[in-house]
Amino acid sequence: MKKIQLYLMFILSVTLLSCSSDSDDNNSNQNPSTNGFLYAENGSTTMTSVSSPYASNQYKSIFAVNNSNTIIEINLTSLAVGSYTIDDTTNFFAYLKPGTTGMWTGSAGTVTITANANNKLTGTFSITSGSGISDVNSVSGSFTNIPIQ
């Protein structure tokens, strides 16, 4: 039942947040220690940032939002400091690649939360396997001092 609820929340989030035009601004950055949310696909060393990352304490989720579009959603069992295995049953990772209509869902990987203090969340993620978009094989990145709402 909990998995169904998380899945429904994910679908609702994607539906509500993905209804605006795409921006041509790529916000590329190669400094992973910058506050915010950075990600790259397929092992690229060029990191891309998003404009409005945040974590939801209520849903135990991390959102990477760019110009009102959800790019990455991570649903976990907790936002406590620790390591979480992405397995598509208890911990879920979704990547909505800009410029496409597809969704890549992670089936293996790890999300590590290294700090949760003062309503800010910091950590890393490395999703090594998934499906849904043929040219995406992996997604990795970091989030540093993103606000917890």
Regions found by a protein language model. Give the residues of each.
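Surface-exposed helix/loop patches within compact recognition domains
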Residues: 37-39, 45-118, 131
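Bacterial Sec-dependent N-terminal signal peptides
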Residues: 14-42
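Sec-dependent bacterial lipoprotein signal peptides
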Residues: 1-19
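Edge beta-strand at a domain terminus
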Residues: 127-149
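A short hydrophobic beta-strand element
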Residues: 119-127
